[in-house]
Curated annotation (Swiss-Prot):
The lineage of its organism: Bacteria, Pseudomonadati, Pseudomonadota, Gammaproteobacteria, Alteromonadales. The keyword Transmembrane helix does not apply. It is found in: Cytoplasm. Residues 249-262 have a biased composition (Basic residues). Residues 380-549 form the tr-type G domain. This is Translation initiation factor IF-2. Residues 143-228 have a biased composition (Basic and acidic residues). Residues 414-418 are annotated as: G2. SUPFAM superfamilies: Initiation factor IF2/eIF5b, domain 3, P-loop containing nucleoside triphosphate hydrolases, Putative DNA-binding domain, Translation proteins. Residues 143-289 are annotated as: Disordered. Pfam families: EF-G_D2 (PF22042), GTP_EFTU (PF00009), GTP_EFTU_D2 (PF03144), IF-2 (PF11987), IF2_assoc (PF08364), IF2_N (PF04760). Keywords: Cytoplasm, GTP-binding, Initiation factor, Nucleotide-binding, Protein biosynthesis.
Length: 880
């Protein structure tokens, strides 16, 4: 088996690398993080760990179980007692946890082991030195004997003069021998001292390490999140509780005896009880200390965050944030969504540092990953011209003449309700036209047309002059900083007045070149074609001055002009390409939707495969219906496009929720009257997205203080069964604008009697909704005076009390109508007639100029000169 590294082994056994290296070091193996570990070294480490913590070590915990069986007599239902068997089981666990004994024992064992090791080593060294000394002495003795024999053989005669030299040699040999023995003994003593010192240091190190490990283990047990029945503190408390429980029985038995005996025994019992209370264990005491200083954190805040999430980021309770926002003037709930600026103010107010993060990093990355290199050449493109003006001033008819097609006849009611996008080839070049609605309800649609355009052609009828939507079109053109060309239409009519048009336009900042301004004027007739060529020439001249250029090659980008849901084709979007080339098969990201282009068609319905700059095109294949005005961008990766679309949808939802600040202080009193307002519920479906937005804005604007238009559901496409069911459940009106209900929806509509209405002209829709709202208004009542009588005399009647003899001066006095009594033109009584007589005959009414007797019910203080006014309450029809 191949060797493994220390890091890999630590991962396998579930320990940190530093701890494993420390255990290797304790086992006598020096290893680093990247070193290999052999099987022999693993076995050596395992043997060491077994020796330290293995099966041979003494047990540290012992569990004892005890069972007690007793019998308890209880009273039965019939007055007889019965015996109940009671079994009590107790489990106790004894743990060996004396830290001092463990440390002392470890120190003694280490010291004894070190001394034995030093003694053995010293004995071995002494034996070796003795052996070496014996060998040296034997060798020296043999050499001396050999020398002596040789000398004796060589010298037969020994003179007395030579004896001092022999003695000197012998003394020198003995001196050398003594010096050698002393050096050997000194060396042995030094080595023994070193071994003893090394053993002492090892024992001290081991004792410190063992003490530190024991301290860490006890601290971990004390600070760890133990179960209430397994922690050391809990076990100590449980043991104390068991002891108290055993003593409680004896105390209860002795209590009655003490009461009987009284006196000293009772006092002793109370004193003993107080002593037991004073020595109660304090093992369950709380050990948390509150921080003395405020904690400042780095809070990372995205574009939106809820109150609970912000509280979690700042490690505070949500109620603290709610209190802080109440101090700042806003009431919020725990699940309310806050925008980034508000969350930043709250966090900084509470003393934290704020780090703003951008959550749309993927979106930014996807949109930047395009073929926009510096080497791509810019080419001239066709101008995008928007036709704007008041309703029925001839915008579509003028465009119709330019295109040589009957477009206006196809619009319902002869008015434009969609943005029409067309491109026209002229002799001098191509022009792309956007035809916008002129009705007041299509303000947002006209604004989108001005945003996506290069030149605005303002159509003004020569016989009608400047109208409200004309002024609005001028404002859109100025806001978009777009050049404005005025086309004065209907010049063929005899009542055409050019000077009036110029004068009215000059009041709104549009001056003709003849009057010293910089706006080009063209006088045209959409009926005869007069001046149309001059208008086209002026458009191309203005485009040449603007030097319109765009990238033709590369990934396309554009804007959604219109979108709809087709029953057979699915979501369809009309896109005006602004740069690059849009091809079939490209992956497009349109606002909240995405998809791969399955088919492309031009404005005439012909299939095409690509479209360059300034070309309007219909695309199929999106995941849903995009909103008009969304930017359309070609991206590389469909998966990333899907992620960006989902992120945008979530962000749109969060922003929508953040705007619904129902609980703000400034809205609180307005919300109190919500129950008093009547609601007209509407389920709205339209053919295209732009018309849907326009109708929604118009209907919402009809709301008053008494009646509110509530669009509970809206969408693009046919009316479905789901829409019909929702309308039936919420008592709503179903409105279809240029769409129809399918078969399943018609069944539900008939069975539930849902009010279904179809419209093709927006005027009729708004008028009928107004009429429905008028019917929901609370009726208004008005008091109308029908007669006036003057009191001429007062008579007393025993039955009726005071009777006023009156002359009718105005109108008719009716007996059934309520009256008022006026004195000096001040109302002093309001009630009803009790009797009305003429010549002692009861009558129903008395006309002007006749005398009559009037008895007022429950009122006798009628005086001469008073006036009696008769009135009736009339209901007045209300209008919006």
């Amino acid at each position: 088996m191949a060797d493994t590294t220390v890091e890999k082994l630590a991962t396998e056994v579930g320990k940190s690398v530093e701890r494993l290296i420390e255990q290797f070091s304790q086992a006598g193996i020096k290893k680093g993080q990247a070193d290999n570990v052999s099987e022999a070294e693993k076995q050596q480490l395992l043997d060491y760990l077994k020796k330290q913590h293995g099966a041979d070590s003494a047990p540290t915990k012992m569990t004892l179980q005890r069972k007690t069986v007793s019998t308890l007599s209880v009273a039965g239902n019939g007055g007889q007692s019965k015996d109940v068997k009671v079994e009590v089981r107790k489990t106790r666990t004894f743990v060996k946890r004396d830290v001092n004994d463990t440390v002392l024992k470890a120190e003694e064992e280490a010291k004894a082991e070190a001394e034995a090791l030093a003694k053995a080593k010293a004995e071995a060294e002494a034996a070796q030195a003795a052996k070496a000394k014996a060998e040296a002495e034997a060798k020296a003795k043999a050499e001396a004997e050999a020398k002596a024999k040789a000398k004796a053989a060589a010298e037969v005669k020994v003179t007395k003069e030579s004896s001092p030299e022999v003695e000197a040699a012998r003394l020198e040999a003995e001196r050398l021998k003594a010096a050698q023995e002393a050096a050997t003994k000194r060396k042995q003593d030094e080595e023994a001292a070193k071994a003893a010192e090394k053993a002492r240091l090892l024992a001290e190190e081991n004792s410190k390490r063992w003490a530190e490990e024991e301290r860490q283990r006890l601290e971990a047990e004390r600070n760890g999140d133990h179960h209430i029945t397994t922690s050391k503190v809990a076990r100590a408390a449980e043991d104390t509780s068991d002891l108290d429980e055993e003593k409680r029985g004896r105390r209860a038995r002795n209590k009655s005896n003490a009461k009987k005996r009284g006196g000293k025994d009772a006092r002793d019992g109370r004193e003993k009880h107080m002593r037991n209370r004073s020595t109660a264990p304090e093992s369950m005491a709380h050990g948390f200390n509150k921080p003395v200083a405020a904690v400042s954190r780095d809070v990372r805040i995205g574009e939106t965050v809820t109150v609970s999430e912000l509280a979690h980021l700042m490690a505070v309770k949500a109620t603290e944030i709610i209190k802080q926002m109440m101090k700042m003037g806003s009431m919020v709930t725990i699940n309310q969504v806050l925008d980034q600026e508000t969350a930043q103010l709250v966090a900084e107010e509470m003393g934290h540092k704020v780090v703003l993060i951008r959550e749309n990093e993927l979106e930014h990355q996807v949109l930047q990953d395009r073929d926009d290199e510096d080497g791509i050449k810019l080419e001239s493109r066709a101008p995008v011209v928007t036709i704007m003006g008041h309703v029925d001033h001839g915008k579509t008819s003028l465009l119709d003449y330019i295109r040589r097609a009957k477009v206006a006849a196809g619009e319902a009611g002869g008015i434009t309700q969609h943005i029409g996008a067309y491109h026209v080839e002229t002799e001098n070049g191509m022009i792309t036209f956007l035809d916008t609605p002129g009705h007041a309800a299509f303000t947002a649609m006209r604004a989108r047309g001005a945003k996506a355009t290069d030149i605005v052609v303002l159509v003004v009828a020569a016989d009608d002059g400047v109208m409200p939507q004309t002024i609005e079109a001028i404002q859109h053109a100025k806001a978009g900083n777009v050049p404005l060309i005025v086309a004065v239409n209907k010049m063929d009519k005899p009542e055409a007045d050019i000077d009036r048009v110029k004068s009215e336009l000059s009041q709104h900042g549009v001056m003709s070149e003849d009057w010293g301004g910089d706006n080009m004027f063209a006088f045209v007739s959409a009926k005869t074609g007069e001046g149309v060529d001059d208008l086209l020439e002026g458009i191309l001249l203005q485009a040449e001055v603007l030097e319109l250029k765009a990238v033709r090659d590369g990934m396309a980008a554009g804007v959604v002009i219109e979108s709809q849901l087709d029953k057979g084709r699915g979501p369809v979007a009309t896109i005006l390409v602004q740069e690059g080339t849009l091809r079939q098969g490209d992956i497009v990201l349109c606002g909240l939707e995405y998809g791969k282009i399955r088919a492309m068609k031009d404005e005439n319905g012909r299939s095409i495969t690509e479209a360059g700059p300034s070309i309007p095109v219909e695309i199929l294949g999106l995941s849903g219906v995009p909103s008009a005005g969304d930017e359309a961008t070609v991206v590389r990766d469909e998966r990333k496009a899907r992620e960006v679309a989902l992120y945008r949808q979530g962000k749109f939802r969060d922003v929508k929720l953040a705007r619904q600040q129902k609980s703000k202080l400034e809205n609180m009193f307005a919300n109190m009257t919500d129950g008093e307002v009547k609601e007209l519920n509407i389920v709205l479906k339209a053919d295209v997205q732009g018309s849907l937005e326009a109708i929604t804005d118009s209907l919402t604007g009809l709301s008053t203080d008494e009646v509110k238009v509530n669009i509970i559901a809206r969408g693009v496409g046919a009316l479905t069964e789901t829409d019909a069911t929702l309308a039936a459940a919420s008592n709503a009106i179903m409105v279809g604008f240029n769409v129809r209900a399918d078969a399943q929806a018609r069944k539900v509509i008939e069975s539930e009697s849902v009010d279904l209405r179809y419209y093709s002209v927006i005027y009729n829709l708004i008028d009928e909704v107004k009429a429905a709202m008028t019917g929901m208004l609370s009726p208004e009542f008005k008091q109308q005076i029908i007669g006036l009588a003057e009191v001429r005399d007062v008579f007393k009647s025993p039955k009726l009390g005071a009777i006023a003899g009156c002359m009718v001066t105005e109108g008719t006095i009716k007996r059934s109508a309520p009256i008022r009594v006026l004195r000096d033109n001040v109302v002093i009584f309001e009630g009803e007639l009790e009797s009305l007589r003429r010549f002692k005959d009861d009558v129903a009414e008395v006309r002007n100029g006749m005398e009559c007797g009037i008895g007022v019910k429950n009122y006798n203080d009628v005086r001469v000169g008073d006036q009696i006014e008769v009135f009736e309450t009339v209901e007045v029809a209300r209008t919006l």
